[in-house]
Amino acid sequence: MIGCGACEPEVKMAGGQAAAALPTWKMAARRSLSARGRGVLQAAAGRLLPLLLLSCCCSAGGCTAAGENEETVIIGLRLEDTNDVSFMEGGALRVSERTRVKLRVYGQNINNETWSRIAFTEHERRRHTPGERGLGGPAPPEPDSGPQRCGIRTSDIIILPHIILNRRTSGIIEIEIKPLRKMEKSKSYYLCTSLSTPALGAGGSGSASGTVGGKGGAGVAGLPPPPWAETTWIYHDGEDTKMIVGEEKKFLLPFWLQVIFISLLLCLSGMFSGLNLGLMALDPMELRIVQNCGTEKEKNYAKRIEPVRRQGNYLLCSLLLGNVLVNTTLTILLDDIAGSGLVAVVVSTIGIVIFGEIVPQAICSRHGLAVGANTIFLTKFFMMMTFPASYPVSKLLDCVLGQEIGTVYNREKLLEMLRVTDPYNDLVKEELNIIQGALELRTKTVEDVMTPLRDCFMITGEAILDFNTMSEIMESGYTRIPVFEGERSNIVDLLFVKDLAFVDPDDCTPLKTITKFYNHPLHFVFNDTKLDAMLEEFKKGKSHLAIVQRVNNEGEGDPFYEVLGIVTLEDVIEEIIKSEILDETDLYTDNRTKKKVAHRERKQDFSAFKQTDSETKVKISPQLLLAMHRFLATEVEAFSPSQMSEKILLRLLKHPNVIQELKYDEKNKKAPECYLYQRNKPVDYFVLILQGKVEVEAGKEGMKFEASAFSYYGVMALTASPVPLSLSRTFVVSRTEVLAAGSPGENKSPPRPCGLNHSDSLSRSDRIDAMTPTLGSSNNQLSSSFLQVYIPDYSVRALSDLQFVKISRQQYQNALMASRMDKTPQSSDSENTKIELTLTEMHDGLPDETANLLNEQNCVSHNKANHSLHSEGAI
């Protein structure tokens, strides 16, 4: 004991090392102290006495060696990685069979051999009870007061022979867990660690190691060896030394079958998602349209899909229910394979998004009709499978939301759809304009398309339908012309150009006569009338022109109807086709913008048909025409029926320029224009006064007297006797006198023209020869007599405005020729042709272009009738 004083530091060091080698025992001692008091502490000190004695007796060299070889101290274990099969539960490690688990070892002096000092046992640490204490002997040690030897170490858990160190305070070891025995669901294992102590030499003289973990002798001389001499396995006294091995997790299905099911479910998920988009995007209206106007393949597809698509809510519920069921099952199977919830969620999300949503929806959005038709049997199958759940829900949706109608486009949407799809459809611009115009017909009013009143061509009701007025109407190009009285806004009648078909401009008929006769109704419409309603009115046939008016209630006074303009059927049609209708008479492309037609030639000029002032036909009453005709036929021998037929005479009197007028000028009474005849000036015409007064100056004495109506002069000018005749021989007579002098009275019954037949060709000389027997009083008439001129020896001057008959020699001779043709027996066609040709030649002088054209046309008609009569030499 004394000698031990010098070794006190070594003893203390050895005692400290011993204490470090037994951490679990120290912790047990502390718990015993707090639980049982000082008695327990004294018992623990008594058990440490041999160790203290051993430390005191050790040599200085031995103590130094023990200090250099420190014992490994294991404090506890933790799982390095946790998952669904390896985790901490209630302070115990829970792992699965047939797995390898990495454990982190915490302690002191962790080295490469630490893995060999760890083991597990199946036997739980034995706990002593108070009944086990001896009655007469010394008290047994407390259950928790010191280390306890482990039971049999298990071979179900194998410590793999390697370790990963970290600063000698921790390291990672790996253990392999064998399968559980049959019928075992789980099994508990407990941690054991190894302790090794040096054995003392015999006789006490040997030097032995005093540290835990050294290899020494069997014990100290005179003392029994400790129970953990050599290598001893004891229970680890920590709280996390229990390991529970559970049964290996089994898959719901075999792995290969589970992979097949996952692939199939992924395909079904994509199919449900694609059909949901593809079929539900095909509304019933679109399917009906495709059935009627699609291609043959599209019609077949739509016919197969339409019965299923008609049950919209039922189809929707079936597809959604199937999609949700498939996606849920897919996630469960992936979780079973992956073994981790997070991994299953990530993998299932990626798979469903890519292969179950994006790809199928991208395909079905473009080819939904074909995909839906080719998979219709699968759709019907799943509708039957989900019938118990989806059908009631669909009926509930039908009751709440109503029956599905489909996409219906209004006018604006339809127009916009046509505009947007214009690059992709086969509509040409004109077709698109017509469709657009027809759809916009109900949105526009007549005020938008009407012609304003200021731009309308109108005619006053006081107008006279003479050549100028009718030419103006024809040049306007309009077929319906409003007629107004007073102001232009006071439209009272409507004139159709076809009403003027039987109106002669020479008749100067008042416009009111025509409008009252036809009495076309006026059609008034209000300015807010829609174009579709206006079109329906025009289609009824009442009128193709309407007068636009509005109620003017501005200012003071009563409201009144104000005429704004006119609208026609052409305006409505132009609005429908979105284009201007240009005919040959239009001057403007648009009656609102007043843009003129670029290619339009000059307007038609009717001035070529207008008579000059000298050619203006004088109008006489039918009664005066009859009296004039009877007077000439009975009183003037040259116009008697024996010389000229009454029919030809009537045509002659109706011929232009036969009846003329002369305006008397009071300021210039002696003007040459006032003389009908002047002495010693040759003339070739006959004059019959119809109205007015004339002064006749005759003879060398210059006798003057006045004459009035139905006095006639110049009969000899028609026959042109070779010598001038005196006044007595020119029979200046009154109304009751008969012209006898100078007339061919000797031969009142001239012979009929001989040698005339259908093949005769009458030249001018032939006609003169044919008429010669009627113009002389003897059988020896000279054709040269026609070349003579008549020179009167009197003057006839107007005293007032005159209206008279003036027949030239040429007109008279042509009338005689026509009379002879009329008396000649021949076909009616030839007769009419010859008479017309003869009367056409009654103009003085050479024929103009119009006369030549008419002669040529008559000749063509005559040749077609196989007649050879020509008009050569017509003057």
From Swiss-Prot:
Pfam families the UniProt entry points to: CBS, CNNM, Ig_CNNM4_N
Region (Disordered), start-end ranges? 122-148, 741-763
Ranges for domain CNNM transmembrane come to 251-431
Q: Which residues carry this modification: Phosphoserine?
A: 761
GO molecular function of the protein, one example? Answer: ATP binding
Cite the ranges annotated as topological domain Cytoplasmic: 272-313, 335-338, 390-875
Q: What does this protein do?
A: Divalent metal cation transporter. Mediates transport of divalent metal cations in an order of Mg(2+) > Co(2+) > Mn(2+) > Sr(2+) > Ba(2+) > Cu(2+) > Fe(2+).
Family the entry assigns:
Belongs to the ACDP family.
Q: What is this protein called?
A: Metal transporter CNNM2
Question: Which organism is the protein's source?
Answer: Rattus norvegicus (Rat)
Instruction: State which gene encodes it.
Output: Cnnm2
